[in-house]
Amino acid sequence: MELPIAPIGRIIKNAGAERVSDDAREALAKALEEKGETIATEAVKLAKHAGRKTVKASDVELAVKRL
């Protein structure tokens, strides 16, 4: 999965950067994808533990807190 690069650039600019290189966009996108997959994996475990097949927002929120 690849996150769209334009929103990644906006995230960096919203953090205060005036200009953002393509390499910086790609590096942040990769980091976010890796972290997102880790969070999603934990959220799936939480849903399964609760006896559900559906991952809820509360599973994701708890996964973020636990990691």
From Swiss-Prot:
Its main location: cytoplasm. It comes from the Archaea. Keywords: Chromosome, Cytoplasm, DNA-binding. Pfam families: CBFD_NFYB_HMF. InterPro entries: Archaeal_histone_HMF (IPR050947), CBFA_NFYB_domain (IPR003958), Histone-fold (IPR009072), HmfB-like (IPR050004), TAF_TATA-bd_Histone-like_dom (IPR004823). Homodimer or heterodimer with another histone. Dimers then assemble into higher oligomers, with the DNA wrapped around the protein core. Binds and compact DNA (95 to 150 base pairs) to form nucleosome-like structures that contain positive DNA supercoils. Increases the resistance of DNA to thermal denaturation (in vitro). This is Archaeal histone B.
